[in-house]
From Swiss-Prot:
It comes from Pyrobaculum arsenaticum (strain DSM 13514 / JCM 11321 / PZ6). Fe cation binds at H108, H112, D286. Its cofactor is Fe(2+). This is tRNA N6-adenosine threonylcarbamoyltransferase. One of its GO terms (cellular component) is cytoplasm. InterPro entries: ATPase_NBD, Gcp-like_dom, KAE1/TsaD, Kae1_archaea_euk, Peptidase_M22_CS. The keyword Transport does not apply. One of its GO terms (molecular function) is iron ion binding. Required for the formation of a threonylcarbamoyl group on adenosine at position 37 (t(6)A37) in tRNAs that read codons beginning with adenine. Is probably involved in the transfer of the threonylcarbamoyl moiety of threonylcarbamoyl-AMP (TC-AMP) to the N6 group of A37. The lineage of its organism: Archaea, Thermoproteota, Thermoprotei, Thermoproteales, Thermoproteaceae.
Length: 332
């Protein structure tokens, strides 16, 4: 079975192929906003519309397959930016209609988790999902991923990106801020707002910008911001590990590329006897392979729809989605 996956939730348009549960590959292009500006949804959508045809041709050519070989089409149905999501949905819908094949709507966050489980050969982990749009600590129980901690406002990646943009550090913000902080010789105290098992990151950005206006060296702010953000996440993760007693801790999403975050979470995992596994860099950011892979497992369990019902959902909680295929990844 050959599955084509389409990812277009935010700044990246990406297509991937999965054959019989194995990832063949992916291609993608990222919309980079003008310096000092955030992502404009319609401009991102225009970018995706322009890039999609050539990406599809390139992907098929690279792997020696024809469009007619595709058996199932999967697309990221949400959450995400409405105009960007619709570009991917329209592309997937058009291909499904042309080929007369099923179409599978995929939750973007769950796809991040499944590609991480696949790539790290994990079965039943506690998952730390961290990206521009997600900050969630989750674990499987009773048909769904249950949330053991999450952000109350903006995601960790978004918070750091916003500071990077205002400070003129460029995009993407997380690696830029981490590089900026490497030369710092000290830390300044940051607020670390944690409410129960939930975190608030919006205030960290505001506080960092306040320090910048007060003349605190940029490198010191960058290092302190990153340390505060990551240690907040580590505290909530540690509590979740103590509660769930999971033996695996999987780190997924674009921010999983952070070497400093890996160090901190590795210490948490070691303390609780959990093996820490980090998604490979090639699958950390938004990618079509994760959509195709999740679509493959979903379709095998009877989860699909018709082109007429292939809608998008800008807001879509991760714990609102059944994952009947969960144990299938343990039996590969």
């Amino acid at each position: 079975m050959l599955v084509l996956g389409v990812e277009s939730t935010a700044h990246t348009i990406s297509l991937g192929l999965v054959k019989d549960g194995d990832v063949l590959g992916q291609v993608g292009k990222t919309y980079v906003p003008p310096s000092g500006l955030g992502i404009h949804p319609r401009e991102a959508a225009d970018h995706h519309s322009q890039m999609a045809p050539q990406l599809l041709s390139h992907l098929l050519y690279r792997h020696g397959v024809r469009l007619s070989d595709v058996d199932v089409v999967a697309y990221a149905a949400g959450p995400g930016l409405g105009p960007a999501l619709r570009v991917g949905a329209v592309l997937a819908r058009a291909i499904a209609i042309k080929l007369g094949v099923p179409i599978v709507p995929v939750h973007h966050g769950i796809a991040h988790i499944e590609i991480a489980r696949y790539a790290t050969k994990s079965c039943d982990p506690l998952v730390v999902l961290i990206s521009g749009g997600h900050t969630v600590i989750a674990g499987y129980s009773d048909r769904r991923y249950r949330i053991f901690g999450e952000t109350l406002d903006v995601a960790i990646g978004n918070a750091i990106d916003m500071f990077a943009r205002e400070a003129g550090l460029g995009f993407p913000g997380v690696p830029a801020v981490e590089r900026c902080g490497e030369s710092a010789d000290r830390l300044v105290e940051f607020p670390m707002p944690i409410v129960g098992q939930d975190m608030s990151y919006a205030g960290l950005t505001t506080y960092a910008l306040k320090l910048l206006k007060e003349g605190v060296p940029l490198s010191v702010i960058c290092k302190s911001l990153v340390e505060a953000a990551y240690y907040m996440l580590a505290e909530v993760t540690e509590r979740a590990l103590a509660f769930t007693r999971k033996s695996e801790l999987v780190v997924a999403g674009g921010v999983a590329r952070s070497r400093r975050l890996r160090e901190i979470l590795s210490q948490v995992g070691a303390y609780h006897g959990a093996e820490v596994k980090v998604v490979p860099d090639e699958y950390a950011g938004d990618n079509g392979a994760m959509i195709a892979l999740t679509g493959y497992y979903a379709y095998k369990r009877g989860v699909y729809t018709t082109p007429e019902e292939s809608f998008v959902r800008q807001r879509w909680r991760l714990d609102a989605v059944d994952v009947p295929w969960f144990w299938d990844l343990c039996n590969r």
